[in-house]
Amino acid sequence: MTKPIITFNNVSKTFEDSGTQVLKNINFDLEEGKFYTLLGASGSGKSTILNIMAGLLDASSGDIYLDGERINDLPINKRDIHTVFQNYALFPHMTVFENVAFALKLKKVDKKEIAKRVKETLKMVQLEGYENRSIQKLSGGQRQRVAIARAIINQPRVVLLDEPLSALDLKLRTEMQYELRELQQRLGITFVFVTHDQEEALAMSDWVFVMNEGEIVQSGTPVDIYDEPINHFVANFIGESNIINGTMIEDYLVSFNGKEFESVDGGMRPNEPVEVVIRPEDLQITLPEEGKLQVKVDTQLFRGVHYEIIAYDELGNEWMIHSTRKAIEGEVIGLDFTPEDLHIMRLNETEEEFDARIEEYVEMDESEDGLINAIEEERNEENL
């Protein structure tokens, strides 16, 4: 990893008036030029992290570093960080030009330089020619672009975005996701984005921090977070999941619904209780006799790109299936899946415990492979 641009070291936050602890020992390093997302439900602590990073809130304990310099006591205007707020915080009585140029005027930048940089920045956010437009006459998407232009005109090291797309309609929000991601990659500025929208986080980010009750419960690439959730909360929060109680018989063999199935997971105790995750899109509908499981279709909804089918097995477990084929309500169908479609989770395992287990398991696996290779080499020498 390259030198981090921002570091949180055991950062906690408790509001003194209520005694409520909203952050618990937050630790992370952010690299320069990447798109990070803090993802969580309302009250999870994600906006508190953003406000501490910006200097709008003080941490109760722990250290915050920018480029290796401790900034806990550094004033907001001394931090090379800019925030785009949910309500955009634009000046309604000013024009687009005046809003974007505001920070440069405070720094007493030359008028010609201001005009040049405002024009360049508005072009970046596709608002060229809007310089004299009143803020009050702009659409929601246009106001969003003005707020972003104002944030990047000073070329800060870090841009913080506090749910800036939440007020936009679905189509415009999707368009802005593409624009924000493309802009961040073009500028090479570190973006830290806050959202409760899982699809938004997965679509835009290089790295996602999933938060719950003031803690980071899992962090990783969008693919890691989606394909390898470490516990029930993450699996249930990120996308749709079928989560079934099971037993890990041994490495690569799991039991649930009274049957044994091959898997690709290992490193757990023999006969350890586990939870099995199968994503709805990984379940294939078959004839009942051809399926690994049999379920009875209860209801279905057409979602445009697929049917969302709810079915129940004989044990009463609910199954969600995404299929391009329409099912018949009341019909018994088979469900097929591969070992790779099963993700096995230990009960209540933390990210630290998960990482330690995987590291130990990989080392053990490599050691066994080395022993097998040594035995085979010895046999080959004896045969010569």
From Swiss-Prot:
It comes from the Bacteria. Transmembrane segments: none annotated. It is a peripheral membrane protein. Pfam families: ABC_tran, TOBE_2. It catalyses: ATP + H2O + polyamine-[polyamine-binding protein]Side 1 = ADP + phosphate + polyamineSide 2 + [polyamine-binding protein]Side 1. Residues 6-238 form the ABC transporter domain. Gene3D superfamilies: 2.40.50.100, P-loop containing nucleotide triphosphate hydrolases. InterPro entries: AAA+_ATPase (IPR003593), ABC_SmlMolc_Importer (IPR050093), ABC_transporter-like_ATP-bd (IPR003439), ABC_transporter-like_CS (IPR017871), Mo/tungstate-bd_C_term_dom (IPR008995), P-loop_NTPase (IPR027417), PotA-like (IPR005893), Transp-assoc_OB_typ2 (IPR013611). Coiled coil: none annotated. Its EC number is 7.6.2.11. Keywords: ATP-binding, Cell membrane, Membrane, Nucleotide-binding, Translocase, Transport. ATP binds at residues 40-47. GO terms for molecular function: ABC-type polyamine transporter activity; ATP binding; ATP hydrolysis activity. GO terms for cellular component: ATP-binding cassette (ABC) transporter complex. Part of the ABC transporter complex PotABCD involved in spermidine/putrescine import. Responsible for energy coupling to the transport system. The complex is composed of two ATP-binding proteins (PotA), two transmembrane proteins (PotB and PotC) and a solute-binding protein (PotD). Belongs to the ABC transporter superfamily. Spermidine/putrescine importer (TC 3.A.1.11.1) family. PANTHER family: SPERMIDINE/PUTRESCINE IMPORT ATP-BINDING PROTEIN POTA, SPERMIDINE_PUTRESCINE IMPORT ATP-BINDING PROTEIN POTA. This is Spermidine/putrescine import ATP-binding protein PotA. It comes from Streptococcus pyogenes serotype M6 (strain ATCC BAA-946 / MGAS10394).
